[in-house]
Design a protein with these regions (language model features):
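Short glycine/serine/threonine-rich phosphate/pyrophosphate-binding segments
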Residues: 33-37, 74-75
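Glycine-rich oxoanion-binding loops at beta->alpha junctions
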Residues: 1-21, 63, 68-69
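A glycine- and small-aliphatic-rich helix-loop capping segment at beta-alpha/alpha-beta transitions
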Residues: 39-50, 82-86, 111
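Accessory alpha-helical/coil subdomains and C-terminal extensions
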Residues: 87-90, 112-196, 203
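Solvent-exposed alpha-helices and their adjacent loops that cap or buttress functional pockets
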Residues: 15-21, 27-28, 64, 73, ...
Length: 210
């Protein structure tokens, strides 16, 4: 929303004037994409919001949503990290994406972007969405540009869905509760996923918790 837009601008302001003697520590977690909102040049804020809403409603997995977000943002896809130069940068990541790809958590604001503009265009085409002209013009105008942002930085994954599930499983079993862990790779529209999980619960042993 507008608050996220203002916050992203202020964040970039804090990074001005850094030197190579400075150290920037970033804490990035799932949900950061929605909070860190600053559209790329020539994309109205409402158009970026519209694209995000359409991708969520059509059931696109978070990996695809974040791939598109990275190419429509002035801070995602490594651009926040590039703004930290020439300072040293270390990112602490709490991952909510299957596989814990750091470039996808919160759309990787401090991690070099490994996806291409053509990837974002392919995702939008696959779902046959009515994309605002400003977004299409921005993406098509970037296709021939060299992909990726080069800067030096390090990162550590300090928490993830997988470690959270294992901790919950261990805690439950320590209290005599038998559980079934479905893993951290489940993606899709919550309504559909919820139905699938409910069916599984009904089939499971009554003494187990899912």
């Amino acid at each position: 929303d507008e608050a996220g837009l203002t916050a992203a601008g202020r964040m970039l302001g804090y990074l001005e004037g850094l030197t190579k003697e400075d150290l920037v520590l970033c804490l990035i977690s799932g949900g950061g994409s929605a909070l860190l909102t600053l559209p790329a040049d020539n994309i109205p804020f409402k158009d970026k919001q519209m694209v995000n809403e359409m991708l969520v409603k059509c059931g696109a997995p978070i990996s695809e949503i974040n791939t598109v977000r990275k190419h429509l943002s002035a801070v995602k896809g490594g651009r926040l990290g590039q703004s930290c130069m020439p300072a040293r940068l270390h990112t602490l990541i709490i991952s909510d994406v299957p596989g814990d790809d750091p470039s996808l958590v919160a759309s990787g604001p401090t991690i070099p972007n490994t996806s291409k503009v053509s990837d974002a265009l392919a995702i939008l085409k696959n779902y046959d969405l009515s994309i605002p002209s400003s977004v299409l013009e921005h993406l098509k105008g970037k296709v021939e540009e060299k992909e990726g942002l080069s800067f030096f930085g390090t990162h550590s994954i300090i928490g993830s869905s997988k470690t959270s599930l294992e901790a919950a499983k261990s805690h439950a079993r320590n209290h005599g509760i038998e559980v079934t862990v479905l893993g951290d790779a489940i993606e899709g529209e919550s309504r559909v996923v919820g139905q699938n999980v409910a069916q599984l619960v009904l089939r499971e042993n009554k003494q187990k918790h899912v």
